[in-house]
UniProtKB/Swiss-Prot annotation:
This is GTPase Obg. GO terms for molecular function: GTP binding; GTPase activity; magnesium ion binding. The lineage of its organism: Bacteria, Pseudomonadati, Pseudomonadota, Betaproteobacteria, Burkholderiales. Residues 160-334 form the OBG-type G domain. Belongs to the TRAFAC class OBG-HflX-like GTPase superfamily. OBG GTPase family. Keywords: Cytoplasm, GTP-binding, Hydrolase, Magnesium, Metal-binding, Nucleotide-binding. Signal peptide: none annotated. InterPro entries: G_OBG, GTP-bd, GTP-bd_Obg/CgtA, GTP1-OBG_CS, GTP1_OBG_dom, GTP1_OBG_dom_sf, OBG_GTPase, P-loop_NTPase. It comes from Burkholderia mallei (strain ATCC 23344).
């Protein structure tokens, strides 16, 4: 199914039914008094989060969603039937905003979370309500109220603990397939990844985290170049960013330091809060660098890049250094997360959008040195 992470829809709640101005008419009861019933309430529009859905594609084409109107009241004190509510199912992680006011209506972060987005109109009152000691035969009644009508902007932001950054062909998809059971498309050409890939990484019983790979960024992404700018929003919920760098590009004219600086620049231009997130440097494809050159090449990169944070040396293809990185990530998340992060990871592990997998060889990852 095609991945769609943004849509605009109109939701229209039902109008309330009108009240009835009816008089009781029965044989031998010439002055029966008022018996007009109330109108039924209009149907409301709700959204509910469903972890079995992973795209907003249903709302890319079905743009108008209407609930039924309430029925009018009738005589003999008959109340109108209320309009049926409608429920729109959306992926967990969907953010809903009112397009006219900019109001944040809902942030669907939990499975089965239900939110009212358009309230049905109240039913009108029948003339029975207007009877008094001085007005025994009232003719007044009220009309039903109109239901709410809203234009909504839907944005899907995936729920992940860790996000991967990097140029196209930095090895992000290979890395996520190496440490989890996600199966992204992998090839030796740019923009192989066209939509976010997610995987649950298990490091032991009850120890897991969710990792997200988005399409690679290129210079100018913040202004719309390439593909990655469309998906940077998916990194906004993460607690840690991994900046993957190809330390052995096929094209010798490519400078990894210049590419790394471009990524950081695009991140800052797109969202300052993303730039401020904790970020680790992961130097990938070291299996392509001769052993006697590795230390010097790593040191040269770190010096020219001016990096002072955590650095990991890995080969996503062979798995070298990946286990140590996985354990370091888990330890960091446990130390810096709130109390319910582990519970959230377990909930996400059961989500069909995420592939739950043990470590390499079917066993939990064993610790491996790799951080500087």
């Amino acid at each position: 199914m095609k991945f769609i992470d943004e849509a605009r829809i109109e939701v229209i709640a039902g109008d309330g039914g009108d009240g009835s101005a009816s008089m009781r008419r029965e044989k031998f009861v010439p002055f029966g008094g008022p018996d007009g019933g109330d109108g039924g309430r209009g149907g409301s529009v709700y959204v509910i989060a469903d972890r079995n859905i992973n795209t907003l594609i249903d709302y890319r084409y079905a743009k108008k969603h209407m609930a039924r109107n309430g029925e009018n009241g009738r005589g003999s004190d008959c109340y109108g039937k209320g309009g049926d509510d409608i429920t729109l199912r959306m992926p967990v992680g969907t953010v809903i905003n009112d397009m006219d006011t900019g109001e944040l209506i809902a942030d669907l972060t939990e499975h089965d979370q239900k939110v009212l987005v358009a309230k049905g109109g109240a039913g009108g009152l029948g003339n029975l309500h207007f009877k008094s000691s001085t007005n025994r035969a009232p003719r007044q009644k009220t009309d039903g109220k109109p239901g709410e009508r809203r234009m909504l902007k839907l944005e899907l932001k995936v729920l992940a603990d860790v996000g991967l950054l990097g140029m196209p062909n930095a090895g992000k998809s290979t890395f996520i397939s190496s440490v989890s059971n996600a199966k992204p498309k992998i090839a030796d050409y740019p923009f192989t990844t066209l939509a976010p890939n997610l995987g649950v990484v298990r490091v032991g019983p009850g120890k897991s985290f969710v990792i997200a790979d988005i399409p690679g960024l290129i210079e100018g992404a913040a202004e719309g170049a390439g593909l990655g700018h469309q998906f940077l929003r998916h990194l906004q919920r993460t607690g840690l960013l991994l900046h993957l760098v190809d330390l052995a590009p096929f094209d010798e004219r490519v400078d990894p330091v210049a590419e790394a600086r471009a990524i950081v620049g695009e991140l800052r231009k797109y969202d300052e809060s993303l730039y401020e997130k904790p970020r680790w440097l992961v130097l990938n494809k070291l299996d392509m660098v001769p052993e006697d050159e590795r230390r010097a090449r790593v040191a040269d990169f770190i010096e020219r890049f001016g990096w002072t944070g955590p650095v990991f040396e890995i080969s996503a293809l062979t798995g070298q250094g990946c286990e140590g990185l996985v354990y370091a990530i888990h330890d960091y998340l446990v130390e810096h997360s709130d109390a319910h992060r582990a519970e959230l990871a377990e909930d996400l592990a059961s989500d069909v959008r995420f592939r739950d997998a043990p470590g390499a060889g079917g066993e939990p990852h064993e610790r491996d040195a790799g951080a500087h």
